[in-house]
Swiss-Prot record:
Keywords: Cytoplasm, Isoprene biosynthesis, Lipid biosynthesis, Lipid metabolism, Magnesium, Metal-binding, Nucleus, Transferase
Gene designation: fps1
Protein name, UniProt field: Farnesyl pyrophosphate synthase
Residues bound to isopentenyl diphosphate: K50, R53, Q88, R105
Cofactor requirement: Mg(2+)
Swiss-Prot/TrEMBL catalytic activity: isopentenyl diphosphate + dimethylallyl diphosphate = (2E)-geranyl diphosphate + diphosphate; isopentenyl diphosphate + (2E)-geranyl diphosphate = (2E,6E)-farnesyl diphosphate + diphosphate
The family this protein is said to belong to: Belongs to the FPP/GGPP synthase family.
Outcome after substituting R104Q: No effect on GGPP synthase activity
Enzyme Commission identifier(s): 2.5.1.10, 2.5.1.1
Organism domain of life: Eukaryota
Binding site for dimethylallyl diphosphate: R104, K192, T193, Q232, K249, K258
Length: 347
């Protein structure tokens, strides 16, 4: 099945799960206008993305089972995949409010839609609650039910911790590079992105396939957290050095005072004179300041540093993958598939 067909099939499953929520609301006599609002919120905030996280649940489950999924198995994996997408949507609704963002996936952010405003705060909670409704409906009788609940709660908490540190370290309206460090960047990336984007989908598939032993989960986490960190460092690099005609966006990390890998590496390597330039220009909303920051990055050979980082990190990831014991039910191809998708990517 092509990537386009996989995406379309996954997308076609969402109305089934939304209908389950809507039908439940009818049984408890929730007014139609509330039900319709909730339904619109669920569709608006979950559709239109790449679905990488949700599809990773299905792909990983199929690899673990070792054969194509029948319809029942597919829907079991798909509902977990959509729970990951709901979690992502919950985070993004709140992120967009906190960041005062204007658009998301090519349309206005939910809080900017007509009549929404601050109601979006409650809508974010409602989107999160849909996860646990679907989890109970589809997995209440499964032996892994409590493990799945705990996994979602743990990863949500981890992501929120990462977001908290990011917000306190790099507020857009208050630049203080003394708060930045590579150690903080690593924590933010691992907690804010890697756990829910890389570890969660695979861990869900492992529970579904019955191979989620403590040893297997630790092995998967060790690999996937490094993969997730590498992915975010790539993102930071592409924001500064990517081709906008390929990435589809013009980078704004320097203007927005982002605690990115690039600025943290620059701070670790720079001379006192270069540090003054970075302090005076980073996070300033003008193109001349941005140019001065980029000039320092060039002097520090950030491009070359990234290439060295990439090769070192990928070598470490491959070593960890080679060490996976497949006799326990875990499969190396889960991780090689992830790595293949992101190695040397340009967007």
């Amino acid at each position: 099945m092509s990537a386009v067909d996989k995406r379309a099939k996954f997308e076609s499953a969402l109305p089934v799960f939304v209908d389950e929520i809507v039908n439940y609301l009818k049984t408890i006599n929730i007014p139609d206008d509330v039900t319709e609002w909730y339904k619109n919120s669920l569709f608006h905030n979950t559709l239109g993305g790449k679905y990488n996280r949700g599809l990773s649940v299905i792909d990983s489950y199929e690899i673990l089972l070792g054969h194509p999924l029948d319809e029942a198995a597919y829907m079991k994996a798909a509902v977990l995949g959509w729970m990951v997408e709901l979690l992502q949507s919950f985070f993004l609704i709140a992120d967009d409010i906190m960041d005062a963002s204007k658009t998301r996936r090519g349309q206005p952010c939910w809080y900017l839609m007509p009549g929404v405003g601050n109601i979006a705060i409650n809508d974010a909670f409602m989107v999160e609650s849909a996860i646990y409704f679907l989890l109970k409906k589809h997995f209440r009788q499964e032996s892994c039910y409590v493990d799945l609940i705990e996994l979602f709660h743990d990863v949500t908490f981890q992501t929120e911790l990462g977001q908290q540190l990011d917000l306190l370290t790099a507020p857009e309206d208050s630049v203080d590079l003394s708060k930045f460090s590579l150690q903080k960047h690593s924590f933010i990336v691992i907690y804010k992105t890697a756990f829910y984007s890389f570890y969660l989908p695979v861990a869900l598939a492992m529970h579904l396939a019955g191979v989620a032993t403590p040893e297997n989960l630790k092995c998967a986490q060790d690999i996937l957290i490094i993969l997730g960190k590498y992915f975010q460092v790539q993102d930071d690099y592409l924001d500064c050095y990517g081709d906008p005609t390929v990435t589809g966006k013009i980078g704004t990390d320097i203007l927005d005072n982002k605690c990115s890998w690039i600025i943290n590496l620059a701070l670790a390597k720079c001379t006192p004179e270069q540090r003054v330039i970075l302090d005076d220009n980073y996070g300033r909303k003008d193109s001349e300041s941005e140019k001065r920051v980029k000039a320092v990055f060039e002097e520090l050979n950030i491009r070359g540093e990234f290439e060295n980082y990439e090769e070192s990190e990928v070598s470490e990831i491959k070593k960890l993958i080679d060490g996976v014991d497949e006799s326990t039910g875990l499969k190396k191809s889960i991780f090689t598939t992830f790595l293949g998708k992101i190695y040397k990517r340009n967007k």
